[in-house]
């Protein structure tokens, strides 16, 4: 597919840093075509007002983060707001829903705003309300009447939110009052409080008629309020990704059980219709879904997420509640490398030299070499392979006319450039894999 030079540069820059790009992932994805019809059907269902839940299952290196960012990119192109929250035992524990909500708000993204889009959504909603008032015949120059009618319409639209999250509704009213009055500092503080931020000044909260901080029980009500606003503002819905949920296996047993119960509650609420317009996705390893320290600890959750994966993976059902991502193989790794090389050419000073010196045969040699350095495990190779391809090979070919990777480049992979999970996965797996000096 053809993409702009700006998009190509964003992809290349992210891979050079060893991270997954956030946009245009369909330009170089390989092997996800089988999921497209089911994913699009789910997005259509959410846009029509349903709630949808999906669990994405795969070992490290299968591309879970890539899949969810591909899904988010696809959703934003359809008018969705998206948010990716990385679950961790210290910064974002799953059992503290108020913290999950705060992270979710911090990472709200639209097609035009890559992060922190809450203000854009709220202001966009106010604009829609004003447009509706103008459509009634109120003159644009009649500022006083426009504000009065818009405020009245805001109260009508907030009626449903007030029932389940009165403090959220109060915060939105307070934000609008401060914004209309030109008090930006108060408006910012009130909106931060509505986004779950602690330590908002008492005077700011008092001006909006709110008090205290968001707690575990109020978080889901606030999420309902956000959904109401963004859908009323013309957005198709909200996609929330909870990434690396398997990390809850490493916390204390009481926190683990609370986290599993919080996940069960979220799934029940989504499927029970509390969150129309919400697509909730989680990612986890097979051990999380099948092991004794994961989903199986909570029987109701295990029942909801159970899918039989004993059958041939070619016939996995993309409509099931749990999706199994296939592991990377060498051919798939090479295909991705070829696509990245072609995207890089769109940003290169010497695109013809890039194509000539990094041909398909060299890409396969590099893929085999990286995989060999990682103990032959193709599944953990994609991130490092693409980082080496872009930063060590393609950049040098483009900048140095004399550079020939077959002659001038020797692959090295150091522990310092690998993630903890990559180091663990590439190490010895059993006693036979440990070398002893005798």
Per-segment meaning from a language model:
Residues 1-52, 146, 402-438:
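A short, basic N-terminal segment
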Residues 2, 7, 187-358:
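The catalytic "switch" region of P-loop NTPases
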Residues 25-33, 61, 94, 161, ...:
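Conserved phosphate/pyrophosphate-binding and hydrolysis machinery centered on Walker-type P-loop NTPases
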Residues 38, 70-74, 96-107, 258-262, ...:
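Alpha-helical scaffold elements adjacent to nucleotide-binding pockets in ATP/GTP-utilizing enzyme cores
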Residues 55, 62, 66-233, 396-401:
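P-loop NTPase nucleotide-binding core
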Residues 66, 130-133, 248-252, 412-422:
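Eukaryote-specific, cytoplasm-facing alpha-helical/coiled-coil scaffolding segments in long proteins
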Residues 176-192, 197, 203, 313-319, ...:
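C-terminal alpha-helical "lid" subdomain
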């Amino acid at each position: 597919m053809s993409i702009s030079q700006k998009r190509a540069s964003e992809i290349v820059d992210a891979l050079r840093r060893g991270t997954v790009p956030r946009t245009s992932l369909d330009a170089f994805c390989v092997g996800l075509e089988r999921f497209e019809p089911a994913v699009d059907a789910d997005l259509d269902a959410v846009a029509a007002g349903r709630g949808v839940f999906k669990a994405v299952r795969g070992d490290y290196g299968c591309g879970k983060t890539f899949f969810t960012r591909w899904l988010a990119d696809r959703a934003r192109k359809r008018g969705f707001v998206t948010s990716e929250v990385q679950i961790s035992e210290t910064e974002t524990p799953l059992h503290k829903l108020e913290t999950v909500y705060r992270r979710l708000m911090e990472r709200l993204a639209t097609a035009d705003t890559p992060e922190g889009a809450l203000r854009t959504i709220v202001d966009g909603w106010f604009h829609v309300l004003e447009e509706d008032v103008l459509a009634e015949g109120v003159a644009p120059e009649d500022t006083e009447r426009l504000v009065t009618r818009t405020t009245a319409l805001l109260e009508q639209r907030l009626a449903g939110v007030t029932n389940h999250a009165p403090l959220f509704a109060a915060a939105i009213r307070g934000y609008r009052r401060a914004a209309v009055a030109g008090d930006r500092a108060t408006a910012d503080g009130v909106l931060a409080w509505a986004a779950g931020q602690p330590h908002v000044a008492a005077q700011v909260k008092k001006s909006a008629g709110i008090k205290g901080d968001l707690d575990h029980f109020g978080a889901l009500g606030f999420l309902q309020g956000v959904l109401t606003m963004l859908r009323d503002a013309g957005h198709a819905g909200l996609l929330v990704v909870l990434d690396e949920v398997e990390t809850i296996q490493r916390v204390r047993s009481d926190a683990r059980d609370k986290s599993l119960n919080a996940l069960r509650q979220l799934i029940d609420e989504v499927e029970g219709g509390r969150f129309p317009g919400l697509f909730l996705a989680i990612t986890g390893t097979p051990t999380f879904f099948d092991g004794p320290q994961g989903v199986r600890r909570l029987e109701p959750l295990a029942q909801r997420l159970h899918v039989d994966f004993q059958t041939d993976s070619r016939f996995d059902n993309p409509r099931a509640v749990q999706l199994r991502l296939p592991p990377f193989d060498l051919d798939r790794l090479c295909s991705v490398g070829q696509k990245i090389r072609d995207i890089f050419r769109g940003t290169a000073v010497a695109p013809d030299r890039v194509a000539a010196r990094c041909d398909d045969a060299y890409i396969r040699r590099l893929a085999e070499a990286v995989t060999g350095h990682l103990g032959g495990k193709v599944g953990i190779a994609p991130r490092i392979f693409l980082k080496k391809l872009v930063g060590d090979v393609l950049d040098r070919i483009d900048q140095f006319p004399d550079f020939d990777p077959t002659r001038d480049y020797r692959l090295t992979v150091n522990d310092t450039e690998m993630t903890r999970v990559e180091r663990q996965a590439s190490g010895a797996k059993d006693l036979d894999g440990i070398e002893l000096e005798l």
